C-alpha cells in the first residue's frame, strides 16, 4: 500500500477531522488548460486520449502541477460503458456524443451484454493503474461512472438531448423495457467501479447528470433505486482503507434526504441549493461536496474569494464532512489563473473553521 502524502479528501468524505477543507474541481483535467489541448491534439481525438494510459495519466496530472488540488480524478468519459456495449459512440463536431446504434426497443436491450471491465474496458483500468503509479501517493485518485439513468438517456436518445422525449416515451409507454436496461446498466456500473477500485481508485463517484429532469416519483423509480443498488454492490474496503462513495444528481436538491439514505458516504451538491440548508437536512448522515457555481470563475479574484468565503461560512464551524468543489464541471473558457485563485482561497479561508 502506497502511503498517501495528502489524504484530506478521503478523511473529509468520512467526516474525519482535517486541517483545511480539501478541494478539487469537476472536469479539472480539460479544455480550459492549454497543456490539455496540446496533449489531446497529440492523441488525435478524445477517445484516443482516453484509450492511451500514458496520455490519460498525463492529462489527469496536469491540473495537479498547476494547482494544489487535494484529489485527482480519472480522465475518462461517462459513456465508456455504452460504447463497450456496442452502441457505436462517436464525437461529432459541434454535436457532442452520438450513438450510431441507439436503443429503440426491447430487443435492443435484450441483445446487449455486460462489458468485461478487464476486457472491452481494460483501457480504463490500465489508465487507473498508470495514474496511481504516476501520482506516487501525492493525493487520492477518484474513479467514476455515469448513473444508469444518465447512461440510458444517451443510449435511448442517441446522444445529448434537451427535451428527453425518446427516453420519457419509453419510460411511460414501455416502463419494463427501461427497467430492464437500467438493471443491466446498474450491474455494469457495479462491475466497472469495482474494477476501478481493484485497479487503484481510492474513492468513487456516480454522476447522475440528468436525474433532475424527472418527477419526484420517477426519480425514485428510474434513477435513485438503481444508484442504491450500485452503492449496495460496491467494494467499500480496499488496501486497508474505506473506499468512500459520492452520489451527485444535478438539480437534485429536492431529493437530498433520499440520496443520503442510500448508504453513500457523500452527496454532491450543485449550485442551486444553499449549503447551509443541505447541511441542516443531511449533514448528520453524510459528507457534502460542492457547490460553487462554475460560472463564478469568470469573476474577479476578489469576487471568487468572496463566494468561497460565503460557502465556507454556510457550511460552518463543524470542521468535518465538506469537500469543496464546483457545482458542476469547470467551463472550457475559464482563465486557468482564476481556477488557481479558487483553490488557494479554499485552502486559506477554510483553516479557521478547522481549529
UniProtKB/Swiss-Prot annotation:
Q: Does the keyword Cytoplasm apply?
A: yes
Q: Which GO terms describe its molecular function?
A: uroporphyrinogen decarboxylase activity
Q: Which Gene3D superfamilies match?
A: 3.20.20.210
Predominant subcellular localization, coarse grouping: cytoplasm
InterPro entries to which the protein is assigned, alphabetical: UROD/MetE-like_sf (IPR038071), Uroporphyrinogen_deCO2ase_HemE (IPR006361), Uroporphyrinogen_deCOase (IPR000257)
A GO CC term attached to the entry: cytosol
Pathway given for this chain reads:
Porphyrin-containing compound metabolism; protoporphyrin-IX biosynthesis; coproporphyrinogen-III from 5-aminolevulinate: step 4/4
The EC number(s) attached to this protein equal 4.1.1.37
User: What broad class of enzyme is this?
Assistant: lyase
The keyword Lyase is assigned to this record: yes
Question: Which UniProt keywords are listed?
Answer: Cytoplasm, Decarboxylase, Lyase, Porphyrin biosynthesis
Q: Which region is the signal sequence?
A: none
Which residues are involved in binding substrate? Answer: 27-31, 46, 77, 154, 209, 328
**Locations listed in the record:** Cytoplasm
SUPFAM superfamilies (UniProt xref): UROD/MetE-like (SSF51726)
Q: Which catalysed reactions does the entry list for this protein?
A: uroporphyrinogen III + 4 H(+) = coproporphyrinogen III + 4 CO2
GO BP annotation list: protoporphyrinogen IX biosynthetic process from glutamate
Record PROSITE patterns: UROD_1, UROD_2
* Annotated site residues (Transition state stabilizer) in this chain: 77
Q: What residues form the membrane-spanning segments?
A: none
**Family according to the record:** Belongs to the uroporphyrinogen decarboxylase family.
Give the record's subunit note: Homodimer.
Question: What is the protein's known function?
Answer: Catalyzes the decarboxylation of four acetate groups of uroporphyrinogen-III to yield coproporphyrinogen-III.
Query: Can you name this protein?
Result: Uroporphyrinogen decarboxylase
User: Gene encoding it?
Assistant: hemE
Amino acid at each position: 500500500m502506497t502511503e498517501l502524502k495528502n489524504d484530506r479528501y478521503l478523511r473529509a468524505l468520512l467526516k474525519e477531522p482535517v486541517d483545511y477543507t480539501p478541494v478539487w474541481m469537476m472536469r479539472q483535467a480539460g479544455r480550459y488548460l492549454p497543456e490539455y489541448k496540446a496533449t489531446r491534439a497529440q492523441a488525435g481525438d478524445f477517445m484516443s486520449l482516453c484509450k492511451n494510459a500514458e496520455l490519460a495519466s498525463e492529462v489527469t496530472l496536469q491540473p495537479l502541477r498547476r494547482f494544489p488540488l487535494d484529489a485527482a480524478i480519472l480522465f475518462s468519459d461517462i459513456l465508456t460503458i455504452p460504447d463497450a456495449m456496442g452502441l457505436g459512440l462517436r464525437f461529432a463536431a459541434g454535436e457532442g456524443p452520438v450513438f450510431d446504434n441507439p436503443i429503440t426497443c426491447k430487443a435492443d436491450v435484450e441483445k446487449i451484454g455486460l462489458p468485461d471491465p478487464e476486457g472491452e474496458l481494460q483501457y480504463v483500468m490500465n489508465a487507473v493503474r498508470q495514474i496511481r503509479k504516476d501520482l506516487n501517493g501525492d493525493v487520492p485518485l477518484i474513479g467514476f461512472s455515469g448513473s444508469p439513468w444518465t447512461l440510458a438517456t444517451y443510449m435511448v436518445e442517441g446522444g445529448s438531448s434537451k427535451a428527453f422525449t425518446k427516453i420519457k416515451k419509453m419510460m411511460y409507454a414501455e416502463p419494463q423495457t427501461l427497467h430492464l436496461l437500467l438493471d443491466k446498466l446498474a450491474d455494469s456500473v457495479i462491475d466497472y467501479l469495482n474494477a476501478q477500485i481493484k485497479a487503484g481508485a481510492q474513492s468513487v463517484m456516480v454522476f447522475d447528470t440528468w436525474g433532475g429532469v424527472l418527477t419526484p416519483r420517477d426519480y425514485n423509480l428510474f434513477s435513485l433505486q438503481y444508484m442504491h443498488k450500485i452503492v449496495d454492490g460496491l467494494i467499500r474496503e480496499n488496501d486497508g482503507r474505506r473506499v468512500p462513495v459520492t452520489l451527485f444528481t444535478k438539480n437534485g436538491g429536492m431529493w437530498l434526504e433520499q440520496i443520503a439514505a442510500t448508504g453513500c458516504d457523500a452527496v454532491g451538491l450543485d449550485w442551486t441549493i444553499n449549503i447551509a440548508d443541505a447541511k441542516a437536512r443531511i449533514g448528520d448522515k453524510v459528507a457534502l461536496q460542492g457547490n460553487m457555481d462554475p460560472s463564478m470563475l469568470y469573476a474577479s479574484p476578489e469576487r471568487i474569494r468572496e463566494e468561497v468565503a460565503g460557502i465556507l461560512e454556510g457550511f460552518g464551524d463543524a470542521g468535518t464532512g465538506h469537500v469543496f468543489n464546483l457545482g458542476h464541471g469547470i467551463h472550457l473558457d475559464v482563465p486557468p489563473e482564476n481556477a488557481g485563485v479558487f483553490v488557494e482561497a479554499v485552502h486559506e479561508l477554510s483553516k479557521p473553521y478547522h481549529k
